[in-house]
């Protein structure tokens, strides 16, 4: 995509817990069973940055989703425990609160569900189970105090439900809006964009048809349709192997194979895309439309 199009999509705002969203964003969806509170957000931030939640004590969520790198790692594929690499790019956490599904193949529906998987993946944080996380959460004095204050729980009553809810609450504060584009399109500031950027936006809407997938609504723009598309990248290189790969994967899945571990552990399996979740042939090689917010620093 030409640079003149993307320049105005890059404003980054780390929003504190608040009752209003930056210009250009819809109301923040917050689960009824996990309301935002400042104390919960602070606990989630601590958990997000805790490197003890890995087999070597070196990898935290923030390792692949670094604040100074727009909550990604700026690598083609992420590097986890002992330098092991996965098969997919680390998506930014910014605005993930608005996404209707998590991971590139949408295998989890919420931030709460998503947050527990990297802990157990052999190429990410590589814990054998969640027990090491819970041991720390239940015995660390600071965590004991925080979980008691936020959830009214301590000891064995603290589970991964509380851990995941705190992490998700923190992640819901990582939002980006109020960019020059937002001020131009939603705020009516005609001078917020340069003439070149205005021409780029016209191309984005019309000849380029970028907006077909990177949608702009009347009152907000997340620049994604939340859908899954096969644009031929990756899977076309192994087209003749796809039938065998798909069949083998379905058989393994029927035997109880873990989708998260399978797609991050094998590059060819990873190329199956959304099919690995739904088993629908039409979704072979399909991946979630990425947001264009902050694309200048995350691409």
Residue ranges of each PLM-predicted region?
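Second-shell loop/turn segments in exported
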Residues: 30-33, 50, 121-123, 130-134, ...
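Sec-dependent signal peptide recognition
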Residues: 2-8
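C-terminal capping alpha-helices of c-type cytochrome domains
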Residues: 21, 130-177, 265-281, 285-296
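N-terminal signal peptide c-region/cleavage motif recognized by signal peptidases
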Residues: 13-18
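Short glycine/threonine-rich turn/loop motifs
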Residues: 19-117, 182-299
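Short capping loops/turns at secondary-structure boundaries
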Residues: 104, 126, 136, 140, ...
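Conserved nucleotide-diphosphate donor binding/catalytic pocket of glycan-assembly enzymes
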Residues: 111-128, 143
């Amino acid at each position: 995509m030409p640079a003149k199009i993307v320049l105005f999509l890059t404003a980054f705002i780390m929003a504190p817990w608040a009752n209003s969203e930056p210009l250009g964003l819809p109301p923040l969806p917050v689960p009824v069973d996990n309301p935002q509170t400042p104390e919960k957000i602070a606990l989630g931030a601590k958990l997000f940055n805790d490197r003890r939640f890995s087999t070597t004590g070196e990898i935290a969520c923030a390792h692949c989703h670094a604040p100074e790198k727009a909550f990604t790692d700026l690598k083609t594929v992420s590097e986890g425990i002992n330098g092991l690499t996965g098969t997919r790019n680390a998506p930014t956490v910014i605005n993930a609160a608005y996404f209707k599904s998590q991971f590139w193949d949408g295998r989890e529906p919420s931030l709460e569900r998503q947050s527990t998987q990297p802990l157990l993946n052999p190429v990410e944080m590589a814990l054998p189970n969640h027990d090491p996380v819970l041991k720390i959460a239940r015995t660390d004095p600071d965590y004991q105090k925080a979980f008691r204050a936020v959830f009214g729980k301590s000891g064995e009553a603290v589970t991964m439900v509380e851990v995941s809810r705190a992490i998700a609450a923190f992640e819901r504060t990582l939002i980006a809006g109020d960019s020059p584009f937002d001020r131009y399109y939603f705020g009516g500031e005609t001078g917020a964009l340069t003439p070149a950027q205005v021409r780029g936006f016209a191309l984005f809407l019309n000849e380029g048809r970028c907006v077909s997938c990177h949608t702009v609504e009347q009152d907000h723009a997340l620049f994604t349709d939340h859908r899954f598309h096969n644009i031929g990248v990756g899977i076309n290189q192994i087209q003749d192997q796809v039938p065998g790969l798909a069949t083998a994967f379905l058989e393994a899945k029927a035997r109880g194979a873990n989708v998260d571990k399978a797609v991050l552990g094998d590059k060819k399996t990873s190329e199956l895309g959304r099919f690995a979740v739904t088993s629908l042939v039409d979704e072979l090689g399909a991946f979630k439309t990425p947001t264009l917010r902050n694309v200048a620093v995350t691409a």
